[in-house]
């Protein structure tokens, strides 16, 4: 019997959920993969459409909902959100056998899972690395994820070259 591969996917916003949705459906077609979905960021906020309901409507079982995110964009709120999620994700990573963690894009909400992946030596699969968003912290966050990632799936050859040059 082949060893099951445990893949945890982390989604933070509607913007990347179409990719998460597609990947979950594809992975679940193959019995070798065990997938678990961790939902955080804006998915649970009413003022962002409470998109957690869309995730459930797609038939996905949510393994963990991270509820510490608030819509405040000030640095103190963001750091507190990340701090709280570091602890929650640490509890998961301490107990679970995880082979890979899938992270999409560049949102600061992902930093808590990146830190835990590094500390618990979990391999990060990053989708959307190498892209450029000038004038905001997205580039810095994306580059942190890219540097921490074990596997990269850039959206174009240009972005692939940017990752290689890092």
Language-model-derived ranges and their functions:
Residues 90-107:
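Short N-terminal targeting/anchoring amphipathic segment
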Residues 10, 38, 103-105, 127:
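Structural motif
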Residues 13, 106-107, 155-157:
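Helix N-cap/beta->alpha junction signal
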Residues 122-166:
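Active-site-proximal region of nucleotide-activated glycan assembly enzymes
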Residues 34-81, 88:
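Conserved nucleotide-sugar phosphate-binding/catalytic loop shared by glycosyltransferases and other
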Residues 1-42:
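N-terminal subdomain of nucleotide-sugar transferases
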Residues 102-119:
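An aromatic- and histidine-rich active-site surface loop
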């Amino acid at each position: 019997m082949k060893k099951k591969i445990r893949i945890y996917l982390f989604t933070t916003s509607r913007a990347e959920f179409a990719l998460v949705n597609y990947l979950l459906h594809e992975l679940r077609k193959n019995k070798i993969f065990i997938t678990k979905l961790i939902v955080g960021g804006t998915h649970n906020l009413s003022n962002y459409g409470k998109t957690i309901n869309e995730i459930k409507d797609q038939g996905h079982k949510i393994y963990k909902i991270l509820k510490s995110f608030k819509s405040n964009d000030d640095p103190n709120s963001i750091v507190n959100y990340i701090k709280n999620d570091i602890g929650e994700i640490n509890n998961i990573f301490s107990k679970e056998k995880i082979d890979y963690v899938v992270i999409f894009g560049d949102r600061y909400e992902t930093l808590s899972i990146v830190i835990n992946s590094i500390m618990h030596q979990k391999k990060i699969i990053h989708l959307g690395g190498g892209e450029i968003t000038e004038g905001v912290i997205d580039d810095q966050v994306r580059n942190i994820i890219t540097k921490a990632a074990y596997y990269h799936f850039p959206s174009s050859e240009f972005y692939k070259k940017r990752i290689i040059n890092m």
